Amino acid sequence: DSWNHFFNNYGMNQIDLDVFSFLLNKGINNKQNLDTETNKLRVNVHQKVLQRNHEVRNSEATVKTRGKYQRIFREDIVLPNYDYQCAVTGIKTLSLLRAAHIVRWADNEKERLNPQNGICLSVLADACFEKGFITIDSDYKVRVSDQAEKDPALYDEISKYDGVKINLPKIKENRPAKRFLLE
């Protein structure tokens, strides 16, 4: 609210990236020094998402930037969409949450930043999803694979979610695309 008042009061509708970075770093008390390169990438990602251009070409996703793209996808897109909780388990401990790609990063350049290709999962749910022990059907219900029964402890942990509808983002446009879930 104070930022809104500041910008409206002084008629500002644009801000230089360096000034934005300075203010952002001041606002977070320099707990995390955000470099200009990361901020430029963050702005670029948000512009791409708004334009529905979710592509990150392999030539863009160098070893140096891939992690930054994925961090922005996690912190700015997926976790906020799911109110910072696992869509399957409801776990809210931030350090245990992952931004899972439904269609893997390596498999589709065009959908890497697509909010509909991301789902917030806990560490265990993410590993189970990645290995196929759990899937999410087109009705957004968790399905536990028969393979999970081979490990009674694992099956005991995840079977309680079988048939349960996942927690979905409030904004319908950010919910998992059924076409991705069916791949």
Model-derived regions: residue spans:
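A detector for short metal-coordination/catalytic motifs
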Residues: 58, 62-63, 68-73, 81, ...
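Contiguous surface segments at macromolecular interaction interfaces
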Residues: 1-52, 170-183
